[in-house]
């Protein structure tokens, strides 16, 4: 089992992008992206393996991606606040190019579970590594993701298999709830536990 772990850690480390993204599959075109959901679980597994620097780089990459596309969140939150329905293809995507850009290939982008999973993974990383300073560094992105989830959790979205985009999925809501609950331990924002309780 130790050999399997060391080989797995080696592959993940080798294929992690210079920016910190975890590629789903480097040799298959449709999967040469980083999914927040998958990447967050990979970061957690790297934390469990003691590879804190790798997980740290991933979380900083997610932070840079959220900051890069923060106006997209602002637009979505504004539309929802005015009772308007955002274009599903204009939502925050489930996956990103490794450089943090957004692909326009028509992939079903609207999946909220990845954003909740990231909050959980970030909180887990801080708890396991003791790198509490990461919360201050990523605070702006944490707040933006909470705004996004608060605006969108009731809306139909794709599930973790990227199917059934016309439904609201308990598995997605569980990821959002779990992420909000986990990150609320580190962020002093009374709205976060209230939102989790509402979900």
Predicted segments with their positions:
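Acidic, mature catalytic/reactive cores of soluble proteins
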Residues: 1-199
């Amino acid at each position: 089992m130790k050999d399997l772990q060391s080989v797995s850690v080696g592959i993940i480390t080798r294929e992690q992008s210079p920016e910190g993204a975890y590629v789903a599959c480097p040799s298959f075109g449709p999967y040469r992206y980083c999914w927040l959901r998958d990447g967050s679980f990979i970061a957690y597994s790297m934390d469990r393996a003691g590879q804190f620097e790798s997980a740290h780089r991933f979380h900083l990459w997610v932070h840079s991606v959220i900051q890069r596309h923060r106006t997209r969140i602002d637009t979505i939150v504004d539309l929802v606040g005015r009772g308007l329905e955002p274009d599903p293809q204009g939502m925050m995507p489930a996956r990103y190019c490794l450089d943090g850009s957004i692909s326009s290939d028509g992939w079903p982008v609207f999946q909220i579970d990845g954003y909740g999973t990231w909050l959980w993974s970030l909180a887990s990383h801080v708890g396991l590594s003791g790198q509490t300073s990461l919360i201050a560094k990523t605070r702006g992105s944490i707040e933006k993701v909470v705004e996004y989830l608060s605006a969108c959790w009731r809306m139909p979205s794709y599930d973790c298999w990227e199917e059934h985009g016309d439904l609201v999925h308990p598995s997605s809501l569980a990821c959002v709830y779990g992420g909000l609950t986990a990150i609320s331990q580190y962020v002093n924002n009374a709205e976060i536990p209230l939102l989790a309780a509402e979900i």
